[in-house]
């Protein structure tokens, strides 16, 4: 068997090696971040991200659909995450006032306090696990590589066709 062609359907040995490292990081990093946040703040990483996104939004509020898009979770998964945060008093839900059709998730003062308390430990863990040991040049390269990947993924996602409410198809934007 000959070596895979860079333009052929199979990954080259180098691509396969990089892909496996990427998969390992993609698997190990969320587990490590979840463990740190759970241990120190009683939060999952996805809950932390929801709180952080709400803290950065105008009026600390986002429509549930916007929140789902921002965290790249399914609407039902976001709804469950928000329900758990709501039970703890960290978030509340209200009917969207602009059209009354959807719900908004709103970060409470208690939620903001818990986010602020959790942030230093989370930031330290991210600095250690993601950026620790990288030179300034490697950090720049990592940012460049991830930006290219994100752009390609977002373009692909935006170009997918989703079923429309009327039974036809529409472009997802």
Can you say where each PLM-predicted feature lies in the sequence?
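N-terminal positioning helix adjacent to the helix-turn-helix/winged-helix DNA-binding module
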Residues: 14, 46-48, 110, 138
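Short, locally clustered residues in the helix-turn-helix/winged-helix DNA-binding domain
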Residues: 23, 52-56, 119
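C-terminal regulatory/oligomerization modules of transcriptional regulators
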Residues: 1-13, 136-173
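Charged, amphipathic alpha-helical coiled-coil/dimerization segments
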Residues: 4, 83-144
């Amino acid at each position: 068997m000959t070596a895979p062609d860079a333009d052929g359907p199979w990954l080259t040995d180098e691509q396969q090696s990089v892909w496996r490292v990427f998969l390992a990081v993609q698997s190990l990093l969320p587990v490590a971040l979840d463990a740190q946040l759970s241990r120190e703040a009683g939060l999952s990483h996805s809950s932390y991200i929801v709180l952080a996104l709400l803290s950065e939004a105008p009026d600390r509020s986002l429509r549930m659909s916007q929140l789902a898009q921002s965290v790249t979770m399914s609407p039902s998964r976001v709804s469950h995450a928000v329900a758990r945060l709501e039970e703890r008093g960290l978030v509340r839900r209200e009917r969207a006032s602009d059209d009354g059709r959807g719900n908004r998730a709103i970060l409470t003062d208690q939620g903001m306090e818990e986010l602020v308390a959790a942030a230093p430990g989370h930031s330290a863990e991210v600095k250690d696990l993601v950026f620790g040991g990288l030179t300034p040049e490697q950090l720049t390269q990592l940012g460049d590589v991830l930006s290219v990947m994100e752009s390609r993924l977002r373009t692909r996602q935006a170009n997918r066709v989703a079923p429309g409410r009327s039974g036809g198809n529409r472009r997802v934007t």
